[in-house]
A protein has these predicted regions:
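Sec-dependent signal peptide recognition
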Residues: 1-8
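Exposed boundary/loop context
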Residues: 8-10, 36
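N-terminal signal peptide c-region/cleavage motif recognized by signal peptidases
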Residues: 12-14
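Peri-catalytic and regulatory segments of divalent metal-dependent proteins
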Residues: 18-131
Length: 131
């Protein structure tokens, strides 16, 4: 009796493993989850909040380096809209973020803690994946 139950259990699990399950497209803005107008509005609101609450690093050399690296990395990404806004946040913590509308924030701590450009770029690639 127990061999029959075990066999039935194994066969049912095998049958379930063969079921074709449709997974949703993750991160696909064109699927209609959010309109381009809503993305633009969210982006504007987010930027206003950052500008009012966060201290920014104002350094043209670091800004240009970060933007050029981000654009270079985006050439091999799936990001269609490459109109990025790069924010350099004056915060020593090791962090970065992405927000709707192509906003990428980079904390100063990322510059301080990355041992080389590859480590820095890997974080930017991660943020690009959110866009």
């Amino acid at each position: 009796m127990s061999k029959g139950i075990i066999t039935l259990f194994l066969l049912s699990n095998f049958a379930l493993a063969q079921v074709d399950i449709e997974l949703p497209e993750l991160g696909d803005r064109v699927s209609g989850a959010i309109s381009e107008a809503e993305v633009e509005l969210l982006s504007e609101q987010f930027l206003q909040q950052v500008y009012s609450q966060a201290a920014l690093i104002v350094d043209p050399i670091i800004q240009e380096y970060s933007e050029l690296l981000l654009y270079r990395l985006s050439e091999t990404s799936l990001v269609n809209d490459r109109n990025f806004t790069v924010l350099l946040i004056d915060d020593p913590s090791l962090n970065a973020f992405a927000a709707p509308g192509g906003i990428v924030g980079i904390n100063g701590g990322l510059f301080l803690n990355a041992d080389n450009e590859s480590q820095f770029a890997s974080v930017l690639c991660h943020e690009l994946a959110h866009l």
